[in-house]
């Protein structure tokens, strides 16, 4: 019998009341969500497991410090025995039952509360506690979770819920080849302007709204061929931008990797990969107190770069020494066209001429960030990722730290990566010709 005042017995009573109190399949999931959170936290507290650590264990597979998971069952049994020895309550059978069932029940409830609020999970969890899958407790933990996933999601899946591949990033630089996709994005169409606007607001020169007979006939023939105007997929574009912004705002994001993924998923994956890998800037370590003080008083010199392709848009127009990705990489530039800013004559918006993005940013070559000086070296392209050897030489734009009234603001240096890392040992290396004279 449960003992009054015992936290383990109290948690067992709550769990038993929940498992037997409602008929399976007739409970409103939204109405009991608060009770499930409380029940989950109560069981974890009895098991002496931190909630955040358990969530990381369920979804990311991070080990729990309190449970030495292993391939053999005695590890789990020794953990249970340790919990029993710390309890003074005489209801040992109830304690043992809660400890054995509790870790699985918390796993099921965590998946329900944070991933998939399906009544199927509630039904499975209740039947599990009532002993309908009692023989599962004789099997390994991973096998029990695999059967739970198979029952709920109808697929073969095992622990943890989210798999993280820690392979080298270069292994995901897919070859430049066209993929045969089975998904086709539907294109939308809208009524043409002449059905929605008067002639004075259409694309007709002012003062020439009246057409002659031949002009009217031609316009009528053209209108009969334009019952609608294609406008692409604005909804897909909106969803893609929202998903991309949301993924970039978090430290981690999970994107499916498959040749059969919908086109919108592929575009999001490629953009996240490119934004995370491409760069035209290298941070230069400051090794001299003189350079430190010069950066503090230096008026910043700005450069312009694209937020998507990460090319510097006001440097690189010419023959500069640079590194590039291998021709088999997705980011290899085959056209090598000039990079600059294009300005729309109608809206005034600025676009990157290299990739067409309107995500244009500016940054300074020198900056004080939380009291720490920063020096940035800018390359002529976006392949800073390929600076993999200390002897590789590249042309860099660096800030001029001089104080001449007609200072040019920046200097061009051809340096190896090793020279760049030790450049700040001598402040004169970061001065233009006018400041040195």
UniProtKB/Swiss-Prot annotation:
The chain crosses the membrane at residues 102-122, 272-292. It is a multi-pass membrane protein. Pfam families: Herpes_UL49_1. GO terms for biological process: viral process. GO terms for cellular component: host cell membrane; membrane; viral tegument. Disulfide bonds: none annotated. Coiled coil: none annotated. InterPro entries: UL49 (IPR004339). It is found in: Host membrane. Keywords: Host membrane, Membrane, Transmembrane, Transmembrane helix. Belongs to the herpesviridae UL49 family. This is Uncharacterized gene 66 protein. It comes from Alcelaphine herpesvirus 1 (strain C500) (AlHV-1).
């Amino acid at each position: 019998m449960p003992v009054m005042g015992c936290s383990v017995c109290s948690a067992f009573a709550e769990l038993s009341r929940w498992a037997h109190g409602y008929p399976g399949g007739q409970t409103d999931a939204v109405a009991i969500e608060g009770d499930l959170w409380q029940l989950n936290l109560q069981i974890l507290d009895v098991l002496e497991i931190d909630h955040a650590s358990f969530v990381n264990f369920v979804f990311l597979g991070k080990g729990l410090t309190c449970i030495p998971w292993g391939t053999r069952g005695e590890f789990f049994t020794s953990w249970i025995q340790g919990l029993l020895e710390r309890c003074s309550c005489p209801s040992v059978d109830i304690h043992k039952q809660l400890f054995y069932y509790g870790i699985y029940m918390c796993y099921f409830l965590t998946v329900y509360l944070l991933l998939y609020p399906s009544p199927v999970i509630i039904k499975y969890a209740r039947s599990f506690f009532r002993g309908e899958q009692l023989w599962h407790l004789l099997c390994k933990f991973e096998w029990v979770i695999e059967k739970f996933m198979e029952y709920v999601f109808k697929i073969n899946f095992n622990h943890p819920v989210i798999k993280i591949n820690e392979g080298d990033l270069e292994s995901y630089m897919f070859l430049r080849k066209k993929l045969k996709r089975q998904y086709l994005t539907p294109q939308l169409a809208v009524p043409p302007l002449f059905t929605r606007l008067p002639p004075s607001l259409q694309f007709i020169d002012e003062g020439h709204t009246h057409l002659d007979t031949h002009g009217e006939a031609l316009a009528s023939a053209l209108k009969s061929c334009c019952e609608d105007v294609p406008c692409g997929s604005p909804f897909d574009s909106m969803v893609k931008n929202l998903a991309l912004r949301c993924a970039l705002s978090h430290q981690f994001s999970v994107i499916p990797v498959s040749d059969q993924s919908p086109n919108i998923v592929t575009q999001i994956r490629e953009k996240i990969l490119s934004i995370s890998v491409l760069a035209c800037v290298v941070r230069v370590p400051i090794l001299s107190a003189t350079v430190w003080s010069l950066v503090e008083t230096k008026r910043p010199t700005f450069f312009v770069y694209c937020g998507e392709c990460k090319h510097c848009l006001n440097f690189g127009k010419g023959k500069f020494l640079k590194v590039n990705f291998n021709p088999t990489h997705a980011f290899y530039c085959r056209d090598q066209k000039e990079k600059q800013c294009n300005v729309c004559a109608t809206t005034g918006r600025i676009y990157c001429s290299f990739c067409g993005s309107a995500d244009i940013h500016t940054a300074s070559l020198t900056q004080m960030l939380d009291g720490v000086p920063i020096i940035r070296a800018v390359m002529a392209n976006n392949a800073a990722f390929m600076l993999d050897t200390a002897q590789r030489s590249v042309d860099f734009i660096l800030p001029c730290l001089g104080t001449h009234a007609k200072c040019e603001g920046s200097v061009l240096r051809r340096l190896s990566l090793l020279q760049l890392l030790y450049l700040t040992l001598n402040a004169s290396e970061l001065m233009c010709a006018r400041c040195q004279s």
